[in-house]
Amino acid sequence: LEVTFEKRDLSRGVGPVLESKPDLVTAAAFFDLVSSDFIRSFVGSVVEARAAFLTVLTYNGISQWAPRHPLDQSIISAFHHHQATDKGFGPASGPTAPAHLADQFKINGYIVSEGDSPWRLNDSHAQLIADLRAGHVAAARDTKLIDADTATKWGALDRTGGVIGHTDTFAVPGG
């Protein structure tokens, strides 16, 4: 078994990275930040290499906070709007990325397995909860869909837990 890691600027395409015909291509916490076009091209390169594929922690749109608050849905909606902005790879797929990845691999004859891998947060994850809350507030503010006072109010809420949904995807060439 030989494992290699390569640091590359993927915004220029992944074809050259896969010229060595790897057996497995992996990524983590990435595909919700890239465009549907990038995903289509990426999958095409993996298929051309006849490699297996595994990605973990692709955000799938589930964002639940505890205790719940009436402002949650407004902040989450603004967060999802922000998710769709360009992060350097075109308009991001955001929560649609897991389905788009699976569809593209299936279209290309791959066998796809998906599984949910949510972050189930509780009071022992206080720092992570605070960081996620701050990220949601910053993203919501950036969209200008939420006024600053509302975002500040939501950000100051005491949260003791929540669920942040992710999907893991594994794909192998069929037949």
Regions found by a protein language model. Give the residues of each.
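A conserved beta-strand element that flanks and buttresses the S-adenosyl-L-methionine
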Residues: 26
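Active-site charged/polar residues at nucleotide-handling catalytic sites that mediate phosphoryl
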Residues: 20
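Conserved catalytic/acceptor-binding region of the Class I
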Residues: 51-116
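A short, conserved alpha-helix within the catalytic core of class I
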Residues: 13-15, 31-51, 55-58
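S-adenosyl-L-methionine
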Residues: 1-17
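C-terminal helical/coil "lid" or tail adjacent to the Rossmann-like core of SAM-dependent
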Residues: 113-158
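Core SAM-dependent methyltransferase catalytic element
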Residues: 164-175
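Conserved acidic residues
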Residues: 23
